Amino acid sequence: MYKSIFNKRTSILFKHFSNKQYALFSVLGKEVLIGTLSIATLSNAKAEGISVNASKADSTFLYHGKEVKLNEVLVTAARAPQASGQQTRMVTVLSREDLKAIPAQSVNDLLKYVVGIDVRQRGPIGAQTDVGLRGGNQEQVTLLLNGINICDPQTGHNTFDVPIDMNEIERIEILKGPSGRVYGTSSLFGAINIITKQAVNNSLHSFVKAGSYGFLSAGVGVHTLKGAVSNALSGSYTRSDGYSHDAKGHHNMDFEGGKAFYQGVYNTNELNVQWHAGISSKGFGSNYFYGPSDNQYEHTFKTFTAIQAETKTGKIHFKPAIYWNRNMDRYEWNRSTPVPVKFNYNRTDVYGLNLNSYFDWFAGRTALGAEIRNEDLVSGHMGELLSTPRHIHGTDRDYTHGLNRTNISFVAEHNLSWQAFNASFGFIATKNSWAEMNMRVYPGVDLSYRLTPESKLYASYSSSLRMPSVTELYYKYKGYEPNKHLKPEELSAFEIGYKYHSNAIQAEIALYHNHLTNMIDWVKRITPDNQFVWKSVNFGVINSMGVETGLHLNLQQLIPAQHFFKSFQVAYTYTHQKVENNKEIESRNVLEYLRHKASAILLMEPITNVSWSMMYRFSDRMGTFTNKEKQVTSYKPYGVLDTRLTYTQPRYTVFVEANNLLDKTYFDFGNVPQPGFWFMAGASFNINL
C-alpha cells in the first residue's frame, strides 16, 4: 500500500482545483501535504512544507537552513490553500494502492481497517451499513462525493448507498473530529470523502467477479479525453443470495443492485469546471434489521447530480457549487406483503448552493464562504400532515406527511505562519428553519509546531452541531416511538498529537476528548402495558476520551537485502465514554461503541507481478442487546482474518480473496449475524483506445 521506494518519489503540486485526483479538501479549498498513508496505520497525514505559489513542487524544502527530502503528495485540506508547511489539519488517506490490496467489495469494507472508524454492517457487500467515527454513530458523520455532501436527512442508515463502483474510486479521505467551519454542521464527528477517477486518456475497462453465497458482480466503464474536456462513464451490477434463511426457508439476506455514474471535467489555466451525475438502485433482505421479523425487505433508489467550478486568476478566487440529491426508500415489514403492516414509502430531495472564496493580504490568507441547503421529505407516515397529499409513483397510495427545512451557514477562516509555527482559526455561523434557535456560532482553532524535519506536534479545538434526522423525529413503527421535539446535538472536541515520518518508519499518536450535549439516541423504555419500545430522546451528556496509535514499517527500506516482505503495519484505538445521569440505559446506537479496535496488515510480493496481503482486525464493542430468547446479552469481542492474492499485468488483473478465513461467528448488531468464510475470485481488464 506504500510505494516500495520512498526516496524516489517526488512531491507533486496539485494547483487548487486543477484537473487532478485530489479531494474533498480541494473542493473545499483546503490544502495539506499528505503521505500515502496505509489504512492500517490508522493514523493521519499531516501537512509538510512546499510553497503553494510555485508552478512546480520540488521534492525538498528548507527547515532552519537544512534541506529536507519529502515523500508526500500535495493536496488540499484547509478552507483556503496556503503553503503546505503551514498546515495544521490531519487527514487519513486510503490510496488506490490500498483499494487494490484490501479484500473488499464495498466502501464499507475498506473502512473496517481504518483506526477510529466503527463499521457496523447488517448485510453482505454493503447492503446496509452504519459508519461512525470516534464513538459517534451513523447520523453524526458527513459523507461527501467529490466534495459534495450526499447525506440523507431521512436516516443515516442509507448514507453509504453511493452510486460508485469500487473500480471507479481513486481514493478516500477521512477527517476526524467536529469541524463545522470546513465541512458544514452535519460533520459532528468527522467527514469521509470519496474521490472518483478522472479520465487521463481514452480507455475502456471492465471487471467480473464471483464467489460464495451466489455472489456475482460485473461492470464496465469508458474514459475519454480531448483537449480541456474529459469524461468518465461507468456502470455495474451486483447480486448475492445472502447467507441466512427465514423460518420458511426463504433467503432473507439476499441482495441485488445496480449503479451508474458519469463525471465530466473542463479545465484551463483560467477556469476549472466539474460536473457529475449518478444513480444507485438496490433491494435487500432485512432479516432482523429494524425489529423482530425475519422477513423484512428494503429497496432504495438514489440519484446525485452536481456542478462545481473555480476561478484561477485574479486577487480573489471564487469556488461555487450547486447540487441536487434525491433519495427514495421503500421498507417492507413483511416482504412483498403489505398486510398487516403497509409498506413505508419515503422520498427526500436535497438542494444545495454554496460559494467559497479566499484572498491574500499582509496578515496572511483569509477565506469566506456561505451555503444554503434545503431538505424536503415526503412520506407515508413520517413528518407533519401535508395540506395536499402527493401521489407515490407506481402505487395506489399517496405521500401524506412531510417535513421541509432550510439550513443557512456562513464561514470565516484565517491562516498564518511564523517559522515552524502554524495556525488556522475561524468559525461557522448557522441557522436552521426547523429548529427554534437564533443563529449559533461554532469556533475552531488548529495549531502545529515542527520539532524536526521528520516530526511535528499539533493541537486543535473544534465544535459543531447536528440537526436530528427525520427518522429520529417522526419514525413510529412496531416497537419505535419518535420525538418531534428533539434538540440539536452539540459537540466540542480537543485533540493533541505527534507524528514521526521518515522513509522507512512512520509512527503517530493522537489523544482526544469529546464533549457531547443533547445527545440523541433510541433508548429502551417500558410502556404502561409492560411492552418494550425504543424511544428517541435527548438524554444526558457524553464525555469521551480516546487514543489512536499507528506504526508502519517499510520492510524493503529497513531490510533492503530481501524482497519478499513489502511492509508491515499495526494500529490500535481505545475509546472510553462516560454518560452523565446514566441509569442503566439500554441504547440503540450511542452506547454500543467500540472500546478497543486493532488491526494489522502484512504486504508481500512472493514473485514478480504477484502481491499477497494478510489482514487482521480485532473489535471489542460495549453495550448490550436483547436476543431472540428475550435475554439481555453483551457483545463479545471478535477477530477476523482476511487475505487477497493478486496477479497484475498492464492490460489485466486476476485475483482471489477470502474474508473471515477462520469462519468466526460475530455480531455488529444484535440478532444480525455476520457472514462466515466467504471466497471470491475475479478479473479486470483495461484497453487503451
Task: Locate each region found by the language model.
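Short, acidic, small-residue-rich periplasmic hinge/interaction motif at the N-terminus
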Residues: 49-100, 108, 138, 312
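Extracytoplasmic beta-strand/coil segments of soluble accessory domains associated
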Residues: 108, 112-148, 152, 170
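Outer-membrane beta-barrel signature, preferentially recognizing the C-terminal barrel domain
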Residues: 291-313, 346-348, 436, 450, ...
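A beta-strand signature from Gram-negative outer-membrane beta-barrel systems
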Residues: 166-203, 554, 559
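Short acidic/polar hinge/loop motifs at secondary-structure boundaries
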Residues: 149-176
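Flexible loop and strand-edge segments within Gram-negative outer membrane beta-barrel domains
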Residues: 240-257, 271-350
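Short strand-turn segments of transmembrane beta-barrel domains in outer membranes
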Residues: 191, 196-224, 235, 250-254
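Gram-negative outer-membrane beta-barrel transporters
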Residues: 417-422, 513-515, 535-624, 684
